[in-house]
Amino acid sequence: VRRALLTLTGVLALAGCGGTSTPARTTLVATLGDSITAGSPGFDPDPLMRDTLGFGADEKSQWQYWAERAHPELRFRNCGVYGQRTDQIAKRLSRCARGAQVLVVQGGINDIAQGRSLDVAAADLRRMVERGKALGLQVTLAELLPWNNGYPEADPKIRRLNELIHGLARAEHVPVLPFYSTLEDPDRPGRMKEAWTSDGDHPSVEGYRLLGERAFRLP
């Protein structure tokens, strides 16, 4: 999460995740965010970046993969870009949301990692919610995850930004996906369970599965 490496826009609709016997999908969910949306480190939605890196092709390393299996009437577009702050994510909203009915907005950990103001990051998230609603989309926000490699210094900032996200959600009447609480280790508050993180920064495949199956809900 801390390395600002990827700046290419990744837009990939997950194809065929539900098999041939599932109902026709009628709702497109655009997911906009940083590496947590992208599926790092196991997946990157940009095929050119996968070719450059030589890895990142494990589709199961996305919460959207598991959410689509749990909700076969939905189709997901992955617009996650590794290392981006909320201001950078916001610039990609219109392209990501094109043709979608639902928009999931996720971001903020790279703002913290780069020493950016929490209030400024929250304002960026607010503008994305407002823009999504103006486009006629159902919008939902996502909490920041615990950050094992940033613990304990980053955790108070993560919790504070999550508080701001929930306040924004109440003001804008949009839901929040409980990413933090879903992956927080009850025995080690402020951190993800070891089995749920691949590198201390991002979820493992099992962590992404929990986010897709337990945390995701339609707005």
Residue positions per predicted region:
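Charged helix-capping and loop-helix junction motifs
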Residues: 118-126, 157-162
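Bacterial N-terminal signal peptides that target proteins for export
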Residues: 1-6
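Bacterial N-terminal signal peptides
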Residues: 7-15
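Catalytic His-Asp segment of secreted/periplasmic serine-dependent ester chemistry enzymes
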Residues: 146-219
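Oxyanion-hole/transition-state-stabilizing segment in secreted/luminal serine hydrolases
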Residues: 31, 38-45, 85-122, 145-149
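Serine-esterase "nucleophile elbow" of acetyl-processing enzymes
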Residues: 17-79, 92-99
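Active-site segments of SGNH/GDSL-like serine hydrolases
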Residues: 106-110, 128-160
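Structural recognition of the beta-strand scaffold that forms the well-ordered cores
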Residues: 29-32, 37, 75-80, 102-107, ...
